[in-house]
């Protein structure tokens, strides 16, 4: 004898009228590390830029849902993402519209044409020397369950081992 159980999440209220309630978007972020033996964790207060676009639509403000287009969220102590300060929560569409999420970190409020600029000349601002990017959350319906977003490093990690040799002395390498 086989028996199966299934459960659905009730996101409606109002009995027979089935008035849809507003559902806030929740994210549970993780980071894919450069090194498989190393676990990267978010720090409380880190910022993330969020885009909520109609499923399979072109990446544009016109296709954004509820004007969620480069909006800021912050990492909380529990590792979840939350809208900053007194800003209203990001809400799913109240109909059955599917959405795609694109996220990046750290958040930059003044992106020009949605291009992230990387300038490694000033290493003091190390947060802006490496960006994280996530586009794995696609085809999502509204839910109270946090959306799992996996961030990856956008830029490759390079390690240079420079040694002195012909034409380059050990003294020359000290100034590098």
Model regions and ranges:
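C-terminal motif of bacterial Sec signal peptides marking the signal peptidase cleavage site
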Residues: 4-7
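Short, low-hydrophobicity acidic/polar segments
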Residues: 10-175
């Amino acid at each position: 004898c086989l028996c199966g159980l299934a459960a659905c999440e009730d996101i409606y209220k109002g009995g027979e009228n089935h008035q849809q309630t507003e559902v806030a978007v929740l994210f549970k972020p993780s980071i894919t590390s450069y090194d498989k033996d190393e676990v990267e964790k978010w720090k409380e207060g880190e910022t993330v830029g969020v885009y909520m676009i109609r499923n399979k639509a072109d990446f544009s403000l016109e296709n954004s849902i509820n004007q969620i287009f480069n909006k800021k969220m912050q990492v909380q102590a529990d590792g979840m993402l939350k809208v900053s300060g007194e800003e209203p929560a990001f809400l799913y569409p109240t109909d059955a519209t599917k959405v795609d999420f694109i996220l990046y970190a750290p958040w930059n409020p003044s992106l020009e044409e949605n291009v992230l600029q990387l300038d490694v000349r000033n290493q003091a601002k190390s947060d802006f020397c490496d960006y994280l990017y996530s586009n794995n959350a696609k085809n999502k319906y509204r839910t109270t369950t946090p959306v799992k977003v996996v961030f990856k490093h956008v830029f490759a990690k390079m390690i240079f081992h420079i040694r002195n040799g012909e034409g380059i002395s050990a003294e020359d390498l000290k100034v590098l």
